[in-house]
Amino acid sequence: GRDAYIAQPENCVYECAKNSYCNDLCTKNGAKSGYCQWLGRWGNACYCIDLPDKVPIRIEGKCHF
């Protein structure tokens, strides 16, 4: 797994306010844990710890929402 911003299918981050929301989202996707990274590169977004390689992550380029 890797530590990364989990992405929606369109390469968009999951915006957040609470750590609990991100922890639920990340663990449902197989990560060890997750939290809401405030004021990060893509604003307030969910960041997952040890997320499985099969789960998409935010990469360079635009978010096509």
Curated annotation (Swiss-Prot):
Keywords: Amidation, Disulfide bond, Ion channel impairing toxin, Neurotoxin, Secreted, Toxin, Voltage-gated sodium channel impairing toxin
Disulfide bonds listed in the record: 12-63, 16-36, 22-46, 26-48
Record keyword Transmembrane present: no
Tissues in which the UniProt entry reports expression: Expressed by the venom gland.
Entry GO terms, CC: extracellular region
GO molecular function per UniProt: sodium channel inhibitor activity; toxin activity
Residue numbers of Phenylalanine amide PTMs: 65
Domain LCN-type CS-alpha/beta stretches: 2-64
Compartment annotation: Secreted
Highest taxon listed in the record's lineage: Eukaryota
Domain notes: Has the structural arrangement of an alpha-helix connected to antiparallel beta-sheets by disulfide bonds (CS-alpha/beta).
Entry similarity comment: Belongs to the long (4 C-C) scorpion toxin superfamily. Sodium channel inhibitor family. Alpha subfamily.
Record function comment: Binds to sodium channels (Nav) and inhibits the inactivation of the activated channels, thereby blocking neuronal transmission.
Annotated protein name in UniProt: Neurotoxin Bot2
Organism (species): Buthus occitanus tunetanus (Common European scorpion)
